[in-house]
Amino acid sequence: MKKITLLFLSLIFTNALALSPYIGSYQLYADTKMGNLQIGSAVLNLEMNGSEFTFTTEAKTESLWKALYDYSRSEKSTGNETDGQVINKYFSVIEKIKDEVRKDYEITIITDKNYALSSTGEEFEIKPGLLVDPLSVYLALSNDMLNNPNQSEFTYQVVDQDGVKYLKFIVEGQENVSINERDIETVRVTCEELELTLNLSVEDNFQPVRIHKVNGKTEFTMLLIEFMS
């Protein structure tokens, strides 16, 4: 696996969404009573087997900060790329704060029968159109922004533990993000329903450079520091 610095990030998504395996390493920050602190790390990992993809994230606080805020979250999304579209089959998430499991569920998507089945026993109807999850939406969004550079709004049918809903992503404009004393030109995209803000690299096919997420009373930021493909 060839190591590439942020300056030379290679192509992740083509216009046909030909997904390529990669690992993105991020620093994890949280707003605390002592200010915005680097408290841990996160990794995004895209694995490919032909047209089948497995996309995972792992975020956790370092041992030094566990007394202040002990947090971990892992997600997994699987599916395939068909005719330039991301088609989901499965999604899971485990989120812990201290010793308490806040989220732990799986969702199996049966596209040809238009429903999704949760590990809680609930069954959700899928409306016409493609379905993504809170993780694979990153893949779908990057591809759509490549193919529709002048579009300012993207809407997706997203499934999670609460069911299937439509989420709207708004392109707010360009914004420079400083990483290692270098300004990276990005496009800022927000999703009000998820309390999510993305900064996607203009030069590197809208690879997430910064991901800002509000979880309850805590705000987290993931900042890209290294990319491997």
Model-derived segments and spans:
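Hydrophobic, well-structured mid-protein blocks that either form specific transmembrane helices
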Residues: 96-138
